[in-house]
């Protein structure tokens, strides 16, 4: 049996900072009259004929079950007294830059994941502070004192655990996961809390009887690889607190895409359009996960003879709407010259990305 080595670097000190309900918190800070009231960042459905989606909301609104990517119409139905604010991205970006400068006081090894969250590697920090927890507390203090906002912090020896830790106690929490506590911490977590495990993977894991980190720990590595491929390799390690991904300084994501290679070639238009739909939904979900919008849709088609065609369309407005991405990608495919060779690869990529408040219209 093939056995892959388990290499666990526990020497690093990683902090994950996640701003608490960032856009809504900025609005509350600038308008104290909003405090204690349900605030939703998104277009008011009463002014748009029920169109639009929720970008984010404050914790008061979340008590009503409102969450990001929910239709504004449903958010209003859940909480008619909610206050809808379209949002001011330029203001949020300015505040985000202010927070980034605070991070840079402690380390230059900062990987922003979006406008309101980032990983920091403070193993060799600028101030020579040995305790990552102390640095996390100082950052929380600085952000509150200078920016007037709260954030949650997770501290551990890798990005995976630090991210989980920052989600553990919100808002304004700080959670430390030591190497000796990692297995116990992960064992109790529902599998859907594992960062990177999507809805379809959760369903598949549940079908396998895997509901918690403890359940995952009991599954042989090759079983996970057989079911999930490379992702199974990662899952096996994450269940053991192993993730050696580095913090990439000032990483800027330039594109988000999804592509698939087919062992059985695609010939029928219905099959091709079905795969375009799957890729479009995957891209839309990734855009949502990374809090991005995109403007340029790129379709990639590789035929059985290895002829590869790539064509792009730039939209007039930013989007992360799955139906729109699918429609445009389908139109691109229809515009391509016919090729009798079967298709071995299909992919959709979104470029011209921006962090932005989602004020996308939806047909509801």
Swiss-Prot record:
PROSITE patterns from the UniProt entry: UMUC
A GO molecular function held by the record: magnesium ion binding
Domain UmuC per the UniProt entry, residue ranges: 14-198
Chain sites annotated for binding Mg(2+): 18, 116
Localization (cell): Cytoplasm
Keyword Cytoplasm part of the UniProt annotation: yes
Catalytic activity: DNA(n) + a 2'-deoxyribonucleoside 5'-triphosphate = DNA(n+1) + diphosphate
GO CC annotation: cytosol
InterPro entries the UniProt entry points to: DNA/RNA_pol_sf, DNA_pol_Y-fam_lit_finger_sf, DNA_pol_Y-fam_little_finger, DNA_polymerase-Y, DNApol_IV, PolY_HhH_motif, Rev_trsase/Diguanyl_cyclase, UmuC
Catalytic residues as annotated in Swiss-Prot or TrEMBL: 117
One record GO biological process: DNA-templated DNA replication
EC number(s) per entry: 2.7.7.7
Broad EC category: transferase
Entries under Pfam families matching the protein: IMS (PF00817), IMS_C (PF11799), IMS_HHH (PF11798)
Keyword Mitochondrion found: no
Cofactor: Mg(2+)
Chief place where the protein resides: cytoplasm
Residues under site feature: Substrate discrimination: 23
Cofactor: how bound: Binds 2 magnesium ions per subunit.
Disulfide cysteine pairs (residue numbers): none
Keywords, in A-Z order: Cytoplasm, DNA damage, DNA repair, DNA replication, DNA-binding, DNA-directed DNA polymerase, Magnesium, Metal-binding, Mutator protein, Nucleotidyltransferase, Transferase
NCBIfam families xref list: PRK02406.1, PRK14133.1
Function: Poorly processive, error-prone DNA polymerase involved in untargeted mutagenesis. Copies undamaged DNA at stalled replication forks, which arise in vivo from mismatched or misaligned primer ends. These misaligned primers can be extended by PolIV. Exhibits no 3'-5' exonuclease (proofreading) activity. May be involved in translesional synthesis, in conjunction with the beta clamp from PolIII.
Subunit structure: Monomer.
Family: Belongs to the DNA polymerase type-Y family.
Name of the molecule in the record: DNA polymerase IV
Organism field: Streptococcus pyogenes serotype M28 (strain MGAS6180)
């Amino acid at each position: 049996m093939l056995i892959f080595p388990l290499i666990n670097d526990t020497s690093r000190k990683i902090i994950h900072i996640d701003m608490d309900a960032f856009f809504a918190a900025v609005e509350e800070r600038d308008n104290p009259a909003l405090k204690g009231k349900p605030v939703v960042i998104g277009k008011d459905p009463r002014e748009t004929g029920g169109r639009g989606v929720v970008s984010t909301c404050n914790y008061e609104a979340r008590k009503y079950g409102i969450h990001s990517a929910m239709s504004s119409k449903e958010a209003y139905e859940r909480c008619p007294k909610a206050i809808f604010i379209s949002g001011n991205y330029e203001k949020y970006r300015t505040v985000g830059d202010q927070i980034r400068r605070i991070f840079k006081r402690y380390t230059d090894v900062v990987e922003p994941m979006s406008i309101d969250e980032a990983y920091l590697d403070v193993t060799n920090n600028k101030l020579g502070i040995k305790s990552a927890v102390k640095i996390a507390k100082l950052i929380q203090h600085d952000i509150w004192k200078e920016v007037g906002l709260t954030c949650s912090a997770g501290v551990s020896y890798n990005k995976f655990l630090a991210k989980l830790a920052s989600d553990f106690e919100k808002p304004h929490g700080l959670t430390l996961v030591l190497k000796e506590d990692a297995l116990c911490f992960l064992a109790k977590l529902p599998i859907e809390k594992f960062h990177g495990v999507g809805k379809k993977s959760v369903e598949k894991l549940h079908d396998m009887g895997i509901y918690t980190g403890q359940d995952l720990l009991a599954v042989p590595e090759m079983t996970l690889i057989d079911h999930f491929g490379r992702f199974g390799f990662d899952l096996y390690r994450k269940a053991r607190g192993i993730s050696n991904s580095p913090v990439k300084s000032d990483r800027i994501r330039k594109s988000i895409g999804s592509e698939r290679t087919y062992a059985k070639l695609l010939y029928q238009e219905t099959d091709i359009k079905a795969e375009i739909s799957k890729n479009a939904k995957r891209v839309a979900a990734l855009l949502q996960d990374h809090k991005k919008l995109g403007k340029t849709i790129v379709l990639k088609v590789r035929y059985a003879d290895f002829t590869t065609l790539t064509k792009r369309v730039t939209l007039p407005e930013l989007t992360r709407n799955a139906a729109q991405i699918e429609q445009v990608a389908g139109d691109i495919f229809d515009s391509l010259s016919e090729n009798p060779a079967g298709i071995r690869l299909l992919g959709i990529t979104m470029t011209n990305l921006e962090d932005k408040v989602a004020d996308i219209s939806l047909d509801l």
